Amino acid sequence: LYVLASHFHPDHFNKEVLDWKTQRPDIIYIFSKDILKHRRAQKEDAVWLKKGEEYADETLSVRAFGSTDVGVSFLIEVENKKFFHAGDLNNWHWMEESTEQEWKGYEKNFLHEVDNLYDYTHELDVAMFPVDPRLGREYMRGPEQFVKRIKTNIFVFPLLDIRGRSRPRCYSEGDQKNA
């Protein structure tokens, strides 16, 4: 069993997962180094990755890519399949609150991180990506830019409602958008 956490925010990391080790001694935790930095876990608790680092064993490999918030995103390769967990990688543009210069800077950072992933792989079997309506009218901008750049067979995203609860969605290649 592998447990990954992309960063220390409570919607992405809960310390209670460390207790699972009592039931599953074979568990391997792979965490972003910012979790250690923010003292949410101890050094001996996990394998710690920052952008550009990789963990590999006989079952899988995990490469850490960047984020446009904190922590990392993960590319997981297992049995010739590629899974991408974006963490908080998104085009956090906040167009309705930011100046044009600010949101274009946010977008540039996002596209740079997507290009870094593209330089490593052009295609994903599954991508898990945050979608947040708080971004306003353009809340799908980041996800659309992502799938336009990187061929993605299945795109899964938690859509946060106005109360912050998650409503997971999944689209396969060829599906029509009908959120």
Where are the model-predicted features located?
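Short glycine-rich, flexible loops that bind phosphorylated cofactors or substrates
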Residues: H12, G136, G164
